[in-house]
Amino acid sequence: MTTSKSPINVAIWAYAIAKKSLPAYSHEKSPHKYTQHQLFALLILKQFFQEDYRGLVGIIADFSDIRKVLELEIVPHYTTLQKASKRLLSSKKIQKLLQTTIKAAQHIELLKEQSSLSALDSTGMEAGHTSRYFVKRRQRGEENMYQTTTYRRFPKLALNCDCRTHIITGLLVGKGPSPDVVHFKKLLRQAHNNLPIQTITADAGYDSESNHIFARDALKIHSIINPKTGCPTKKLPSGKYRREMVEHFDKDKYGQRWQSETVMSMLKRNLSESIFSKNYWSQRREMALKVLSHNIMIV
């Protein structure tokens, strides 16, 4: 699926989606200088242009057509946008905005009422400021010996996408390294609530009998997860659904799982793989904003 390269088109859609998702002002007594709709659209454009707050303000000051589209009489100070990011990108508001992008895709008949095939995946993002932590692992057979292993913390994004349209229907943001398998249920439930799913595919990182049971029995979603996790063995898995994956693995449908990798590539290519925010919560907001920007650029 192609993405828009027009900042005017992106601004129009971002502005419209914000109007459907958010009240004009956060509080009746708040300063009525800029609407939340205008500020959200500007945050999307920040991602589109891959600029910092100061850089975006400079672009908007020179771009009268964008100001006209957003009904913006005065260009906000960059600190106004920084504060707006904290206020507009709370978890609840992100979900509301994500749901509105999905409805927008349905409105233009890009997305159907349900996803016949979806895929889960995760990726690490580049951060300019990364911290290290140390893990001490007791060496096997040595009672008081420890092995020190160094890891690099990085912003991590997990998502679910519709394989046909590349629209993202669910997201989780956090820190890596972390196992994918523990996020499967939360991410799948969120995505299924946003857009009903018929079949879900996922790589071996999400493989567990518990995840199959949750998808198939709790949500009534057909799950196809690569069963080749853990040490290689000739023994069949003991679980019903993991055994089915070994004996009757649907290679054709699972082959479409690469569409999620395409979405990750689109995100990093169009909106940068770098996360410029320095602290954890700002990084979470920036990753969520990339997802919203991706969907808006598609519609």
Label for each model-derived stretch:
Residues 2-49:
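Basic, short loop/linker segments at the boundary and entry of helix-turn-helix/winged-helix-like folds
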Residues 54-70:
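DNA-recognition alpha helix
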Residues 38, 60-62, 77:
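Non-catalytic DNA-binding core/recognition domains of DNA-processing enzymes
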Residues 69-89:
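Major-groove recognition helix of helix-turn-helix-like DNA-binding domains
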Residues 31, 37, 48, 90-217:
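Polybasic low-complexity intrinsically disordered regions
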Residues 204-271:
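Helix-centered, glycine/charged polyanion-binding patches within enzymatic domains
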Residues 250-299:
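Basic, amphipathic alpha-helical segments enriched in Lys/Arg and hydrophobic/aromatic residues
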Residues 42, 56, 77, 81, ...:
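Mobile genetic element proteins and their domesticated derivatives, centered on retroelements
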